[in-house]
Amino acid sequence: MAAVDIRDNLLGISWVDSSWIPILNSGSVLDYFSERSNPFYDRTCNNEVVKMQRLTLEHLNQMVGIEYILLHAQEPILFIIRKQQRQSPAQVIPLADYYIIAGVIYQAPDLGSVINSRVLTAVHGIQSAFDEAMSYCRYHPSKGYWWHFKDHEEQDKVRPKAKRKEEPSSIFQRQRVDALLLDLRQKFPPKFVQLKPGEKPVPVDQTKKEAEPIPETVKPEEKETTKNVQQTVSAKGPPEKRMRLQ
């Protein structure tokens, strides 16, 4: 397959000479466009003949052939240059348009190129959709046609899910949570309590019963003996006083 010349496809390239950008204006833009390194410029044009003979651009109207003119200028950003075929002083045929934005030269696409690009983009998208659909289509003489998406579902299951990064809580959040838990504990006390680590939880009612002191039960016989002892003690008189020896 023969290599494609760069001049046959000028829509995908641009050209710029940074040394001209500060002095670029309506009077110098055609000289800037006629630089030798510019791939958009045709050396066989009438502008080159006028330049070599040191004539003004007004002589282009009296010549026949390819020429470049300044079609529109919006200094200092935008300039539009047209390439045209002059057949007579009053008859010209436009061939191509070039626009210069901030010193960079581009070729403006023609209507056929724009339509061709849009159609190719649409056809490529439709073709990709049909290829993707056909990859899931299955056929069997006994079953007919059906869609098979099992492989796609298995691939989704195999893909690891991205883990969310856990951010540490602030001091205010921890204090707030502790206060809420304490409030809930007071409103709804626990029904089971674990007295010691490792032991089974015990109901709260049982722990309260164990904590209360058990009253001592006194037998009636013991009560009667204590009463008799108290009566004998009270019946006896006070102890006699012994006389002291002088």
From Swiss-Prot:
The keyword Nucleus applies. Its main location: nucleus. Residues 193-246 are annotated as: Disordered. One of its GO terms (cellular component) is membrane. GO terms for molecular function: DNA binding; transcription coactivator activity; transcription coactivator binding; ubiquitin protein ligase activity. The modification N6-acetyllysine is found at residues 236, 241. It holds the Pfam family Med6. It is found in: Nucleus. The keyword Ribonucleoprotein does not apply. GO terms for biological process: positive regulation of transcription by RNA polymerase II; positive regulation of transcription elongation by RNA polymerase II; positive regulation of transcription initiation by RNA polymerase II; protein ubiquitination; regulation of transcription by RNA polymerase II; RNA polymerase II preinitiation complex assembly; somatic stem cell population maintenance. There is a cross-link at residue 208 (Glycyl lysine isopeptide (Lys-Gly) (interchain with G-Cter in SUMO2)). Keywords: Acetylation, Activator, Isopeptide bond, Nucleus, Transcription, Transcription regulation, Ubl conjugation. Component of the Mediator complex, a coactivator involved in the regulated transcription of nearly all RNA polymerase II-dependent genes. Mediator functions as a bridge to convey information from gene-specific regulatory proteins to the basal RNA polymerase II transcription machinery. Mediator is recruited to promoters by direct interactions with regulatory proteins and serves as a scaffold for the assembly of a functional preinitiation complex with RNA polymerase II and the general transcription factors. Component of the Mediator complex, which is composed of MED1, MED4, MED6, MED7, MED8, MED9, MED10, MED11, MED12, MED13, MED13L, MED14, MED15, MED16, MED17, MED18, MED19, MED20, MED21, MED22, MED23, MED24, MED25, MED26, MED27, MED29, MED30, MED31, CCNC, CDK8 and CDC2L6/CDK11. The MED12, MED13, CCNC and CDK8 subunits form a distinct module termed the CDK8 module. Mediator containing the CDK8 module is less active than Mediator lacking this module in supporting transcriptional activation. Belongs to the Mediator complex subunit 6 family. PANTHER family: MED-6-RELATED. This is Mediator of RNA polymerase II transcription subunit 6. It comes from Homo sapiens (Human). The lineage of its organism: Eukaryota, Metazoa, Chordata, Craniata, Vertebrata. The gene is MED6.
